[in-house]
Amino acid sequence: MGRKRWDLVLGACMAVCVWSCNNDDNLNGDVKTSGTAHLYATTHTGQVKRYDINSGDVTTYNTASTDAEGIYFSPEDDSFTLVSRSGAGLETYANISSFRSGASVDLEPEFSIAGSLESPRDLAVKGNFYVVTDDTDLDEDELTHEGRIFIYTKDSNGFSLRNVVTTKFRVWGIEFIGDDLYAAVDETNKIAVFRNFLSNHTLNRIVTADKIVAFQGLVRTRGLHYEDGVMVLSDIGEAESNNDGALHVVKDFESKFAATSSGGFVKTEDQLRIAGNNTLLGNPVNVIYDSNYNVIFVAEASNGGGRILAFNDATSIDGNIAPDLKYTLAGVSSVYFHTR
């Protein structure tokens, strides 16, 4: 699919007003559609929603999980894999396109692996490697921070746990850029990178990040997503507040990160920041950036009881702006956008 402006697609979402009876929905505009544009969202009830941006249909998948956080859709397998907090593992659901769009369907996993995770948070996929963060306080000491990263492999028979590494900080969101894994250092304004992550860390052991960089103006990093040179970071601010969240957009991210010394920070003037009461950002726990539409999708956990938000013109907007799309989804925990 060619490069498009997101506002051309919003009109298709007029039909989506049936998604919820909440008057909070704000979906309008003219539309020219093509290809596939599916937004997947997990929830803390275990339901997965798929919003068809072109048609306005919403499909509800009732999974075996009762709490999910993290999702990846594989067009090759016509399946999605979610991180199950209730099942403490991964679950894959197949033949997704075989169900009628707009239906509510009960699913059983094609295969799963359970029992390893304690408090899973995010999922990053590279080839047949499925990498999951876990922010469990291993020593139950609030003065010492640690987290874990679980590395699974997937084949036609299911998942296998290859190894688990322990980080020297609480870890939340993760994102691959090439072979390097970037991770949000929870409770800080920092991002860490592990170079050649999958090949350098094959054993169960404590690992040290190759570099940690702070971002000026950011309070508490939670989600991150990278595409075509642009990194979007979500800032939940104070966890108890539902109106102090923000998004930080960093263009030419790799060069700015490389130019900053470990322990240093990327200046505010090298970022775009979306924040303020008009944004409806309180606790943006997960984000997806799509460069074709130049849009940011946000899983907003607290404002309005839980919402999915979208911001148009992502690489040029800044300040206290209203989202271009908003609708209520209680318990939303992560989002994934598939387009072609």
Model-derived features: where do they sit?
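Post-signal-peptide N-terminal segment of Sec-exported extracytoplasmic proteins
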Residues: 37-79
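Blade-level signature of beta-propeller repeat domains, shared across WD40, Kelch, NHL, RCC1
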Residues: 304-312, 317-340
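Conserved beta-strand positions in repeat-built beta-propeller and related beta-rich domains
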Residues: 33-34, 39-45, 74-75, 81-87, ...
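A short beta-strand motif characteristic of beta-propeller blades
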Residues: 56-64, 103-114, 158-165, 203-215, ...
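Short loop/turn segments immediately following beta-strands, especially the blade-tip
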Residues: 92-103, 140, 151-158, 194-204, ...
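A short loop-to-beta-strand structural motif that recurs across blades of beta-propeller domains
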Residues: 47-49, 67, 89-94, 145-151, ...
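Bacterial Sec-dependent N-terminal signal peptides
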Residues: 1-46, 53-55
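Beta-rich, blade/repeat-based domains predominating
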Residues: 24-35, 65-79, 114-129, 164-180, ...
